[in-house]
Curated annotation (Swiss-Prot):
<keyword id="KW-0464">Manganese</keyword>
<dbReference type="GO" id="GO:0005829">
    <property type="term" value="C:cytosol"/>
</dbReference>
<comment type="similarity">
    <text>Belongs to the NAD-dependent DNA ligase family. LigA subfamily.</text>
</comment>
<feature type="binding site">
    <location>
        <position position="433"/>
    </location>
    <ligand>
        <name>Zn(2+)</name>
    </ligand>
</feature>
<comment type="function">
    <text>DNA ligase that catalyzes the formation of phosphodiester linkages between 5'-phosphoryl and 3'-hydroxyl groups in double-stranded DNA using NAD as a coenzyme and as the energy source for the reaction. It is essential for DNA replication and repair of damaged DNA.</text>
</comment>
<keyword id="KW-0436">Ligase</keyword>
<dbReference type="InterPro" id="IPR001357">
    <property type="entry name" value="BRCT_dom"/>
</dbReference>
<feature type="binding site">
    <location>
        <position position="454"/>
    </location>
    <ligand>
        <name>Zn(2+)</name>
    </ligand>
</feature>
<dbReference type="Pfam" id="PF03119">
    <property type="entry name" value="DNA_ligase_ZBD"/>
</dbReference>
<feature type="domain" description="BRCT">
    <location>
        <begin position="640"/>
        <end position="719"/>
    </location>
</feature>
<dbReference type="Pfam" id="PF12826">
    <property type="entry name" value="HHH_2"/>
</dbReference>
<dbReference type="GO" id="GO:0006281">
    <property type="term" value="P:DNA repair"/>
</dbReference>
<feature type="binding site">
    <location>
        <position position="185"/>
    </location>
    <ligand>
        <name>NAD(+)</name>
    </ligand>
</feature>
<keyword id="KW-0234">DNA repair</keyword>
<dbReference type="GO" id="GO:0003911">
    <property type="term" value="F:DNA ligase (NAD+) activity"/>
</dbReference>
<dbReference type="InterPro" id="IPR018239">
    <property type="entry name" value="DNA_ligase_AS"/>
</dbReference>
<keyword id="KW-0460">Magnesium</keyword>
Length: 719
């Protein structure tokens, strides 16, 4: 997960991170829901989901079809249990992590219903059980099936195993509706978990990690006798398909479940105020250590079922419920060292090496230290944190399993009379490649400037270099780039952009032939070589974009190409541009610097990134090798087109049927227009295809002209 704030991500960086997050979250969903083998904590998973949602909110045009925000859980594992399609989807809940989040949730309920706070809508509050979600179906009072949640739409048929859980009735009392689906959580009591582990240890077998995983694994045993021996339990709290509703409130339905013989949680209560909900949350939190079952928060639900119906659902969660998660757990240990990791974007991230400590049932040896200011005791806005205490090797530190993929150090405990180590000096040189590491003004992160040579960034940089809007080399996808990068044979390896263009020649002089390697063949290799050769001449803006200079995305690459017209002119400007001396108000910087700032849309942040990139000798060496193989074509000078859209800002939305989105952007730019990804007051024209949604609504609201795709072709004279 990137450490760059969402607001500072470029569109390219955002798209790349959304792709990585989609893969990571899908991977962890499968491990958690389908294989019962989670690799990360719930808090770490929640952090990935929050990061994904934050990026999507900031870049709505980049929301993917496979976005985790549109998905619940994971599809059931194959070839184990028969699939069951839920009559009503089993959705997940949105999360709240603070009192303010809860107040926002309650406020959103009132606003949606058009009611005032003094109308006193009642909410229920109950512990969020850390187990396995289950749907149990009864027809004419007889238990006919039990299914896991799966991906929310399709679960697994575990009926035989459900029947072994003593707390789940096989029959409902007379008078129950003809069709009943009772939903709840299967879990293992802490005491039963300890007994089971003691038994496994006595038998010389491997013990289990935690009650949740054990319950999930026990329920998905192919032999129901194994499930029966595990003493699984159940809490009922919801329902699916019902032929008749026996109550009109959430609390009333749970009481009906109790009367039918299902266990229900005794800590569930009803409140008419946010303060009541939060007080109960804290009370349950205090009682949490004494409970014989694991919980990870408190769930709030609108009590009246008619209001639940009016509130309805979002794509993956109800509007009438939310899960208020408990804060992370903490422990005290010793900081033994600090290592610096270099991320794919060149960010230098300090990682604490700790004396091993158990936090929340997991042994922790590493923790994130975020950035150099965090080590110094300085917050994101320059304010003191931890009362200004810095972090030093040898300190006693408080470790928390929180919202990061790895735990974090949240405080330092200073011991009176104990001599501390020296203040930590954050490196100004990349430990991976030796290039300068710079920190931009206003940034918390220090970054390596050796983008084209740094091994920590190389794979990501090459992927970017061959991507569609850069060199667009067909046959060099993600897997192929990793294969060539990891190849040890000099005739195969691709470690820098220039290596791509020398691959064919190296292969001709080698006994190791690419076409003989699994996954390749004579035809595919020829196509790859042809695709590479086709890019030996490349448009200047594509060349600049492909270099991966920070802040030089597709738009800025085009701006620079149009301003300098040739690569030679751009390179000369980049090498001669000298920023003004810090603190010297009379210094305006070199003439080349001032010229670069005069380019429309290019400010000091972009210009500094260009200067830093070309100021790194390693990058210039890699560029020299690349330019020996590739020729950036001069950009044609922009002339007035006389087009009716010249100088206007155009937004394309919906499904385009006569052209791709990239073709649409290129056509607009060919006619002198600028394209944007979102609608604002600066937008002049919206071209809307079928399925246009929020952008079309925004354009209508702002009174912006909207035309269809056919009208667009007529307008620009290309019909």
């Amino acid at each position: 997960m990137s450490d760059i704030s969402v607001e500072k991500l470029t569109e390219l960086e955002a798209a790349a991170e959304l792709e990585r997050l989609a893969r990571a979250i899908a991977h962890h969903d499968e491990l958690y829901h389908a294989k019962d083998r989670p690799e990360i904590s719930d808090a770490a998973y929640d952090a990935l989901k929050r990061r994904n949602e934050a990026i999507e909110a900031h870049f709505p045009a980049l929301v993917r079809d496979d976005s985790p925000s549109r998905r619940v859980g994971a599809a059931p594992a194959l070839a184990t249990f028969a699939p069951v399609v839920h009559a009503r989807p089993m959705l997940s809940l949105d999360n709240a992590f603070s009192d303010e989040d809860v107040r926002d949730f309650v406020g959103s309920v009132y606003r949606f219903l058009g009611q005032l706070p003094d109308d006193s809508i009642a909410f229920t509050a109950e512990p969020k059980i850390d187990g396995l979600s289950m749907s149990i179906r009864y027809e004419n009072g007889i238990l006919v099936s039990g299914a896991t949640r799966g991906d929310g739409t399709t679960g697994e048929n575990v009926t035989a195993n459900i029947r072994t859980i003593a707390e789940i009735p096989n029959r409902l009392p007379a008078g129950a509706p003809a069709v009943v689906e009772v939903r709840g959580e299967v879990y293992m009591a802490k005491s039963d978990f300890l007994t089971l582990n003691a038994q496994m240890e006595a038998e010389g077998k491997q013990t289990y990690v935690n009650p949740r995983n054990t319950a999930a694994g026990s329920l998905r045993q192919l032999d129901a006798k194994v499930t029966a021996s595990r003493k699984l339990r159940f809490f009922a709290y919801a329902w699916g398909e019902m032929s008749d509703m026996p109550a009109d409130t959430q609390l009333g339905m749970v009481e009906v479940f109790r009367q039918w013989g299902f266990p229900v949680n005794p800590l569930m209560k009803r409140f008419n105020s946010v303060d009541g909900l939060l007080a109960h949350y804290r009370a349950i939190g205090m009682e949490r250590p004494t409970l014989d079952y694991d919980i990870d928060g408190v769930v709030y639900k609108v009590d009246r079922l008619d209001l639940q119906t009016r509130l309805g659902f979002r794509s993956r969660s109800p509007r009438w419920a939310i899960a208020h998660k408990f804060p992370a757990e903490q422990a005290l240990t010793i900081l033994r060292g600090i290592d610096i990791q270099v991320g794919r974007t060149g960010a230098l991230t300090p990682v604490a090496r700790l004396e091993p400590i158990t936090v929340g049932g997991v042994v922790v040896t590493n923790a994130t230290l975020h950035n150099e200011d965090y080590i110094k005791g300085i917050g994101q806005k320059g304010e003191p944190i931890r009362e200004g205490r810095d972090i030093r090797i040898g300190d006693s530190v408080i470790v928390q399993r929180a919202g990061d993929v790895i735990p974090q150090i949240v405080d330092v405990v200073l011991e009176e009379g104990k001599k501390r180590g020296e203040p930590y000096q954050f490196p100004h040189v990349c430990p991976a490649c030796g290039s300068h590491a710079v920190r931009e003004e206003g940034e918390a992160v220090r970054r390596c400037t050796g983008g084209l040579i740094c091994p920590a960034q190389a794979v990501e940089r090459i992927r970017h270099f061959v991507s569609r809007n850069a060199f667009d080399i067909e046959g060099l996808g993600e897997k192929q780039v990793e294969f060539f990068f990891n190849a040890e044979d000099p005739a195969l390896c691709i470690r820098s952009p220039a290596d791509i263009f020398t691959l064919k020649k190296r292969q001709e002089n080698s006994l190791t032939k690419l076409q003989n390697i699994e996954g390749f063949g004579a035809t595919s290799v020829k196509k790859l070589y042809d695709a590479i050769d086709a890019r030996r001449e490349i448009a200047l803006h594509r060349f600049l974009f492909g270099l991966g200079i920070r802040h030089v995305g597709e738009v800025n690459a085009k701006r620079l190409a149009r301003a300098y017209l040739s690569y030679a002119a751009f390179e000369k400007a980049a090498l001669e541009a000298v920023p003004p001396k810090e603190g010297d108000r009379t210094d305006k910087g070199s003439e080349a610097w001032q010229d670069m700032l005069a380019v429309e849309g290019i400010g000091s942040i972009v210009a500094e990134a260009v200067v830093d990139f070309y100021g790194e000798p390693h990058n210039r060496e890699v560029l020299a090798a690349l330019l020996a193989e590739v020729t950036p074509l001069d950009e044609e000078a922009r002339v007035a087109t006389g087009s009716p859209v010249e100088g206007k800002t155009v937004v394309f939305t919906g499904s385009l049927e006569r052209m791709s989105r990239d073709e649409a952007k290129a056509m607009a730019e060919r006619h002198g227009a600028k394209t944007a990804g979102s609608v604002s007051k600066k937008t002049d024209l919206v071209v809307a295809g079928p399925g246009a949604g929020s952008k079309l609504a925004k354009a209508t609201e702002l009174g912006i002209e909207v035309i269809n795709e056919d009208d667009w072709f007529k307008l620009v004279g290309e019909d």
